[in-house]
Each structure stands twice: as C-alpha cells, then as structure tokens.
Amino acid sequence: MISRLTGKLVEKNPPQIVIDVNGVGYEADVSMQTFYNLPPVGESVQLFTQLIIREDAHLLFGFATAEERKTFRQLIKVGGIGAKTALGILSAMTADELAQAVAEEDVKRLSSAPGIGKKTAERMVLELRGKLVAHAVTDGLFAAAPAADETEDIVGTLLALGYSEREAKAAVKGVPEGTDVGEGVRLALKNLLK
C-alpha cells in the first residue's frame, strides 16, 4: 500500500499530477480541491494517497490532507460510487462541506456533484450518516465526536459485546473528540449503563 508520497512535483495536468520520489515518478489523480492547493511545478510536495488495484489497472489517488483521504475511503464504500465519482464529489465540495450536507440530509446539495443523482445522494445520506465528521465547526451544527475510524471501531466493539447497532451508535455520541478506541469503548459502555 502506498499511503503517502513526499517528493518533487514534476507535472500538473488536471486532474493528474506526477511526483518524483527519488527518481521514480508516481502519477496520481487528485481532486480539484487538492490540485488548486499544490505548489508550483519543481517544488517539494507531500500527498496522502490511496492505491486502488483493479484487474486492469493500479490507480493512485492523492489528497492534500489525511481527512480528505479518509472521506474518499468512506465514499467508495457507498454502493454506486466508484473512485472516479468519489474524486468528483471531493472536487465539487470539501470534506467538511460533504459532512455537513450528509448531516443535514441535503440531497439537493449532494446531487449537485458530478455523477450523483437523487437516488445516489439519498443512498449517501443513508450510508454515510454518522461516519463523516466535520472538523471546521460552522454555525454550531457539529458536536465534537471521535474521528470516523475510531467511531467505527468503538461501534464494532459494542456490537461484538451484544449491543444493537442503534444502542451502540447512541452511546458513541457521548464520546469526546480525539478519544482512542479503548477509552472510547469504556466511555460508551458507561453511557449505556446510565
């Protein structure tokens, strides 16, 4: 797995870039959000990446932040959304804007992204609800919560302990942001026993 690249930016042709890392050029597709934040060609750059291996190709996708990559990983888990469509969504809106649209069940905003119709937008709301966390607090809409990966791990542990998915998700809502999985499970169990 190629998780991160640090090297010299040698080509920029939207949506693709090439990064030279010790003499090896890595081509990656990037969202337009990432593309516009890249330095000029010839300068050093760091990119968080996701490698997708298909029968006919190895595709590398690059992101300016780990949060954008995490959002991409959640998007490609949604039925009907492939890697290129997920990249298009992240080109149309930031990870925080996407999290806000999902939290507000804003199907109209979600379906404004390229390749996303009303039914896919509704599926996104259904499948991503509670999995995306906005990090920039806007209008007090988002309460602090553990990062999406930690939340999934905490919920998974509670499910393994025999709690229903509804109970597990409700218990995780009271766990503060930045809490590791072990402490998060302890706090969630405490919430369940109240």
Swiss-Prot record:
Gene Ontology annotations for the cellular component aspect, listed alphabetically: cytoplasm; Holliday junction helicase complex; Holliday junction resolvase complex
Stretch list, region Domain I: 1-64
Role noted for this protein: The RuvA-RuvB-RuvC complex processes Holliday junction (HJ) DNA during genetic recombination and DNA repair, while the RuvA-RuvB complex plays an important role in the rescue of blocked DNA replication forks via replication fork reversal (RFR). RuvA specifically binds to HJ cruciform DNA, conferring on it an open structure. The RuvB hexamer acts as an ATP-dependent pump, pulling dsDNA into and through the RuvAB complex. HJ branch migration allows RuvC to scan DNA until it finds its consensus sequence, where it cleaves and resolves the cruciform DNA.
Cystine connections: none
Domain of life: Bacteria
Keywords: Cytoplasm, DNA damage, DNA recombination, DNA repair, DNA-binding
Stretch list, region Domain III: 147-194
Keyword DNA damage: yes
UniProt note: domains: Has three domains with a flexible linker between the domains II and III and assumes an 'L' shape. Domain III is highly mobile and contacts RuvB.
Pfam families, sorted: HHH_5, RuvA_C, RuvA_N
Subunit structure as annotated in this protein's UniProt entry: Homotetramer. Forms an RuvA(8)-RuvB(12)-Holliday junction (HJ) complex. HJ DNA is sandwiched between 2 RuvA tetramers; dsDNA enters through RuvA and exits via RuvB. An RuvB hexamer assembles on each DNA strand where it exits the tetramer. Each RuvB hexamer is contacted by two RuvA subunits (via domain III) on 2 adjacent RuvB subunits; this complex drives branch migration. In the full resolvosome a probable DNA-RuvA(4)-RuvB(12)-RuvC(2) complex forms which resolves the HJ.
MF terms in GO: ATP binding; four-way junction DNA binding; four-way junction helicase activity
Protein name: Holliday junction branch migration complex subunit RuvA
Family: Belongs to the RuvA family.
Region listing for Domain II, in residue ranges: 65-143
Cell location: Cytoplasm
GO biological-process terms attached to the record: DNA recombination; DNA repair
Primary localisation category: cytoplasm
Region (Flexible linker): 144-147
SMART domains reported for this sequence: HhH1
